[in-house]
Amino acid sequence: MAKKVDGYIKLQVAAGAANPSPPVGPALGQKGVNIMEFCKAFNARTEKFEKGMPIPVVITVYTDRSFTFETKTPPASFLLLKAAGLKSGSGRPNTEKVGTIKRSAVQEIAETKAADMTGADIEAMTRSIEGTARSMGLVVED
């Protein structure tokens, strides 16, 4: 028989840097999950990512206090800033442009995010990522 789900925990944790300090410790502690077990498993699974890259994770906690977790792809905003070589986006994106990004780089990001996005096709996902870029003050050029 399948285990009964107690709840879900959604977090963004830096790749290879999960530790018991906030926000990981308190979120898992509330559900009674073994924090160190999660940290070791998460760090092992995110070795392939660049250290410090924010990785969204959905943790499924069961009533017997066991858990499973699923990692997602990094946020589009992080990937866009990395591709543009910037630290942060614009505070006023419609008036202040902070950089430019090539459409080919946006397409690559859309392909990376394809597993997590619910777009109909790669073109729709690319347009969605372009919108994110514009809302951050980036100019998308051909």
Curated annotation (Swiss-Prot):
PROSITE patterns: RIBOSOMAL_L11. InterPro entries: Ribosomal_uL11, Ribosomal_uL11_bac-typ, Ribosomal_uL11_C, Ribosomal_uL11_C_sf, Ribosomal_uL11_CS, Ribosomal_uL11_N, Ribosomal_uL11_N_sf. GO terms for biological process: translation. One of its GO terms (cellular component) is cytosolic large ribosomal subunit. The keyword Ribosomal protein applies. Keywords: Methylation, Ribonucleoprotein, Ribosomal protein, RNA-binding, rRNA-binding. GO terms for molecular function: large ribosomal subunit rRNA binding; structural constituent of ribosome. One or more lysine residues are methylated. Disulfide bonds: none annotated. The keyword Membrane does not apply. Belongs to the universal ribosomal protein uL11 family. Forms part of the ribosomal stalk which helps the ribosome interact with GTP-bound translation factors. HAMAP family: Ribosomal_uL11. Part of the ribosomal stalk of the 50S ribosomal subunit. Interacts with L10 and the large rRNA to form the base of the stalk. L10 forms an elongated spine to which L12 dimers bind in a sequential fashion forming a multimeric L10(L12)X complex. This is Large ribosomal subunit protein uL11. It comes from Shewanella loihica (strain ATCC BAA-1088 / PV-4). The lineage of its organism: Bacteria, Pseudomonadati, Pseudomonadota, Gammaproteobacteria, Alteromonadales.
